[in-house]
């Protein structure tokens, strides 16, 4: 199970209805944050995303993406946390991130590691990885992609029974691609196991202009979370501030062949009424939604549509 919970969807500053950037990402039993703007920990409480965060993936060190880290670390310490936490950021981010961590150093009793990442680097787990990719924001900035490993192909249990293979460890060996011997016969795994099935991919752009790197990283992604700070009427402003319009984000999703586009990082002018942004994007890429604080989206295995799990509480 992969679940995204939007903790903050506003650009630059919070509004009454939207906090600044933060997304809780749950992959099975693992929990991460993509960005951590001010007030993120309160949003985590409000939307019950959990505090067992293993790592924070920072896209860049602008205030609306990192100022929530200090308070979050203090709260974790007050809760008795002992496990270490890793903060991943782009090149050149260590000095700022270290200063943010040190603001709460007297209250943090667990290890915090800061890791700078180039494109292609990041966190590796048994069945997935979270890697950085370069974006265009006029400063050192990256996006992040959660990429699952391919899953094993389907195992034909019926055929295995017909071939006289006893249930038990041999089934597992064959499913893992290992040939086995039964009554003097060598059974090849390829006879019983189908082709590997692709894992899921979730891509988060962070703040950026539309760029080829995001398109490439989001190629056939299940979900692309892309910033849409402005509408098309502010295209010039988006260009000189290093941001994207809803149309820009939609064109990226279309070129990448993404499954669904979720728009975030909205200017305060759109906070209360996002219909224009959504219509603008959908005219190019129909499978688009504007994210809102508290929206929880599950990304299923590639056999069905995403389902919205929870409405934000009022």
Annotate each PLM feature.
Residues 38-88, 116:
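Active-site metal-binding motif and surrounding structural segment of the metallo-beta-lactamase
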Residues 111, 277-294:
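Structural recognition of alpha->loop->beta junctions
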Residues 81-116, 269:
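Active-site neighborhood of divalent metal-dependent phosphoester bond hydrolases
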Residues 1-49, 144-146, 153, 194-205, ...:
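Conserved beta-strand hairpin/beta-sheet module of binuclear metal-dependent hydrolase folds
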Residues 34-37, 54-61, 90, 203-208, ...:
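Active-site neighborhood of phospho(di)ester-bond hydrolases with catalytic His/Asp-centered motifs
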Residues 24, 118-263, 271-284, 300-314:
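Metal-dependent phosphodiesterase/nuclease catalytic metal-binding core
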Residues 5, 88, 113-117, 131-133, ...:
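General small-molecule cofactor/ligand-binding pocket signal
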């Amino acid at each position: 199970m992969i679940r995204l919970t939007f903790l903050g969807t506003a650009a630059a500053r919070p509004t009454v209805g939207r906090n600044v950037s933060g997304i809780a990402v749950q992959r099975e039993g693992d929990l991460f944050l993509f960005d951590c703007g001010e007030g993120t920990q309160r949003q985590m409480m409000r939307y019950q995303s959990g505090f067992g965060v293993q790592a924070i993936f920072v896209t860049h060190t602008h205030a609306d993406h990192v100022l929530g880290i200090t308070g979050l670390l203090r709260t974790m310490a007050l809760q008795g946390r002992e496990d270490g936490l890793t903060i991943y950021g782009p090149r050149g981010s260590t000095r700022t991130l270290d200063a943010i961590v040190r603001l709460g150093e007297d209250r943090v009793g667990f290890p915090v590691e800061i890791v700078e990442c180039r494109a292609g680097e990041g966190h590796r787990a048994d069945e997935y990885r979270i890697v950085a990719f370069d974006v265009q924001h006029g400063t050192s900035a990256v996006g992040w992609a959660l990429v699952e490993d391919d899953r094993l192909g389907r195992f034909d249990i019926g055929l295995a029974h017909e071939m006289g293979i006893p249930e038990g460890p041999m089934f597992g060996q064959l499913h893992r691609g290992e040939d086995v011997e039964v009554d003097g016969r060598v059974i090849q795994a390829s006879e019983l196991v189908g082709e590997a099935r692709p894992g899921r991919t979730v891509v988060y752009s962070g703040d950026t202009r539309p760029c080829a790197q995001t398109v490439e990283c989001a190629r056939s992604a299940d979900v692309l979370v892309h910033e849409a700070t402005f509408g098309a009427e502010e295209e010039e402003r988006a260009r000189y501030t290093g941001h994207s319009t809803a149309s820009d984000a939609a064109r990226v999703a279309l070129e990448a062949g993404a499954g669904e586009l979720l728009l975030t990082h909205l200017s305060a002018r759109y906070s209360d009424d996002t219909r224009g942004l959504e219509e603008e994007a959908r005219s190019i890429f129909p499978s688009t939604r504007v994210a809102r604080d508290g929206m929880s989206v599950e990304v299923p295995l590639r056999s069905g549509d995403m389902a919205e799990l929870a409405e934000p509480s009022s």
